């Protein structure tokens, strides 16, 4: 079966939401396409003196509610359509969380494992130079994504500020604390995933503390979500990364697994596991809660028939294909969509941006409290829409909320020119 095109998946999700909204078809069509996409070729000198070229993208999908917002990823699988889709999901992620941003996304086609730190710095600074006319504190605010982090964000900030001869810490988020970052940012996506899991179990009149949990993907989002969900009393019985999965029916020590992965580079071989499994086996385990926290399209239509979890909370972006989503809906599996569950990252990025503009630092407790309030309010808005509009699932309900907010902003601004 061919892999689903993520941009087409986004458009299908918007069409699904449109069936429950009184929105002009032309306006909805406008919301299905990016306003602009930058595609550029970076020519960068390698350590050995040779020149290598890299294809890079930045999609600015929609800015009706505020500056474009979204991460930059480094991955050999980056495509133009993927970047467009991810930038679109950011529009609706910021809207469902009701924070004043639009959506953007960027990426470079490369495997960072194949390059030295100095080469990655030159690649990053070359991309930042190309982005310079398009980004800014009130224009487009990038952030980390797959295979990028504080280091890369610091390089982009420094490049922008040097070229612009200014101080603009809010031009980028996800920075190190000493470079204007925010407390709580590193754990934010995993924390919002935990809040979403807690809220959906409460909504279903179930207790998260009694749940068994499997987490696919043990990077930042997955490992933090696993740790915080375990702190709620749940038994995290299986986790995985690209090397495979480890399982213990009595529960894994999530912190010990993270320490083992940090030391060895993978979860495979963790001595606290009773068996090792494939990623596919983890996705079809008999558990109460499944948390996909890896890349897009982890669960397709065929695999969805074998998913044995009662609840799926999407820590990753687009881990279900639309057909898989339909299968899980038909089977009665409750799915909390990515645009709400993993919105912690962009929400705390917003907090970082606010702190940068105020030149004032919040405490971690304040960050976490504000994040919890936004995620719980967003969850309530989603479930209200689900019940009031009669949507088939929570994903469509989340898009109903988000699309309506974007449409209201667009129509309220009038036409120009």
UniProtKB/Swiss-Prot annotation:
Protein name in UniProt: NADP-specific glutamate dehydrogenase A1
Organism annotation: Halobacterium salinarum
Similarity comment text for this entry: Belongs to the Glu/Leu/Phe/Val dehydrogenases family.
Location of the active site: 105
GO BP of this protein: glutamate catabolic process
Misc remark: Strain NRC-36014 contains 4 distinct glutamate dehydrogenases while strain NRC-1 contains only 3.
Reaction equations catalysed: L-glutamate + NADP(+) + H2O = 2-oxoglutarate + NH4(+) + NADPH + H(+)
EC numbers for this chain: 1.4.1.4
Gene that encodes it: gdhA1
Any one Gene Ontology molecular-function term assigned to this protein's record: glutamate dehydrogenase (NAD+) activity
């Amino acid at each position: 079966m061919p892999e689903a095109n993520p941009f087409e998946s986004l458009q299908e999700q918007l069409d699904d939401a449109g069936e429950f909204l009184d929105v002009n078809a032309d306006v909805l069509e406008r919301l299905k396409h990016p306003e602009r996409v930058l595609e550029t070729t970076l020519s960068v000198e390698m350590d050995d003196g040779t020149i290598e070229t890299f294809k890079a993208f930045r999609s600015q999908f929609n800015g009706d509610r505020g500056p474009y917002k979204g991460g930059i990823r480094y991955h050999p699988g980056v495509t133009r359509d993927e970047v467009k889709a991810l930038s679109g999901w950011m529009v609706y992620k910021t809207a469902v969380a009701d924070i004043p941003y639009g959506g953007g996304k960027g990426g470079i086609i490369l495997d960072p494992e194949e390059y030295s730190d100095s080469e990655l710095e030159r690649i990053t600074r070359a991309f930042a130079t190309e982005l310079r006319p398009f980004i800014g504190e009130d224009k487009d605010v990038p952030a980390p994504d797959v295979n990028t982090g504080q280091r890369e964000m610091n390089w982009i900030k420094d490049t922008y500020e040097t070229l612009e001869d200014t101080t603009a810490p809010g031009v980028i988020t996800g920075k190190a604390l000493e470079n204007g970052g925010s407390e709580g940012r590193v754990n934010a996506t995993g924390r919002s995933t935990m809040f979403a899991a807690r809220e959906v179990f409460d909504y279903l009149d179930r207790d998260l503390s009694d749940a068994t949990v499997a987490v696919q993907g043990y990077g930042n989002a997955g490992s933090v979500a696993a740790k915080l969900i375990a702190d709620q009393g749940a038994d995290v019985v299986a986790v995985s990364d690209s090397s495979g999965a480890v399982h213990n029916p009595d529960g894994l020590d999530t912190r010990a697994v993270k320490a083992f992965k940090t030391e060895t580079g993978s979860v495979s071989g963790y001595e606290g596991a009773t068996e090792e499994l494939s990623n596919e086996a983890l996705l079809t385990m008999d558990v109460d809660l499944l948390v996909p926290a890896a890349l897009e399209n982890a669960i397709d239509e065929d695999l969805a028939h074998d998913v044995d979890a009662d609840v799926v909370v999407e820590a990753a972006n687009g881990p279900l294909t639309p057909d898989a989503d339909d299968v899980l809906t038909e089977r009665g599996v409750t799915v909390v969509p990515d645009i709400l569950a993993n919105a912690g990252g962009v929400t705390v990025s917003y907090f970082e941006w606010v702190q940068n503009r105020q030149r004032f630092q919040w405490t971690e407790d304040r960050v976490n409290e504000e994040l919890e309030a936004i995620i719980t309010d967003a969850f309530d808005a989603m479930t209200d829409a689900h019940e009031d509009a009669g949507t088939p699932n929570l994903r469509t309900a989340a898009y109903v909320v988000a699309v309506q907010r974007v449409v209201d902003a667009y129509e309220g601004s009038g036409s120009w020119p």
